[in-house]
Amino acid sequence: MGISKKQVVLGTVVAVAGLAVFANQPHDVSAASKEKTVTVGLVGDSDRQLWEYVKKDAAKNYGIDIKLKLFTDYIKPNQALVDKSIDLNAFQTINYFDVQNKNFKGKLVSVGKTYVTPIRIYSDNHKTLADLPKGGTIVVPNDPSNEKRALDVLEAAGLIKYNHDVKLPSAQDITENKKDFKIKEVASDQAASALKSADAAVVNTNYALDAKLDIDKALYVEPVNKANKGYINIIAARKGTQNKKIYKQVVKAYQTESTKKHMKQLYGSAEIAAWDIKLK
């Protein structure tokens, strides 16, 4: 049976209409691509170097495109997480997270451990703790969680004692200071540069690495034990998103033997993988 001209025209109209409908559909490919993208907030370039390897592993093993967003301080990454400008962040200790999460009314959730970095006391002018002069200046971070940690380190090193009844102590809570050290409080990211005008400084490891401080020449190293388990670093997500499969896959991509290997290559003894660490 032959096909009439009318049938040909009708078939053409239907085909064109079908194409038009298809063209107006959402781009499923790009939508799927967006769903496989995770933006992770970091602080400092030293962490970025390790996450570049994690990024490759996540792409290879899970098809995830990790975007890295760098911050220069410890305040903005949690705000960015709450504001939804990033999906995860990986920069803070458990103790710092607990303090910040109260400020953000419980909107943050820990989704996995990363590493622990024993912080150290550094000096450009002295080789041992005993060399620190009476009345000398020691720099510590000024945000509550990191200042408490710095005071713990100074106390463990035998330089001061402070009132442990205070939940978030500052230099004002020091109760014993036999060498009359002047404790100077500065922003965490300024502690390393403050060494130029101070006798010593307690510097967070990521900032110490960024400043190219020699960790092997530190005057004192914070002990890694159960008492300091709150200083393990974590990956955080927004509350309500923590069970997303893709976020769990990012954590899995981080917590691998490959990451341990790269961590050792990049940082030596400065960082210790913490997801399977056994503290005594």
What residue ranges belong to the model's regions?
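Sec-dependent N-terminal signal peptides of Gram-positive bacterial secreted proteins and lipoproteins
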Residues: 1-28
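Ligand-binding "clamshell"
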Residues: 99-111, 125-126, 202, 210-223
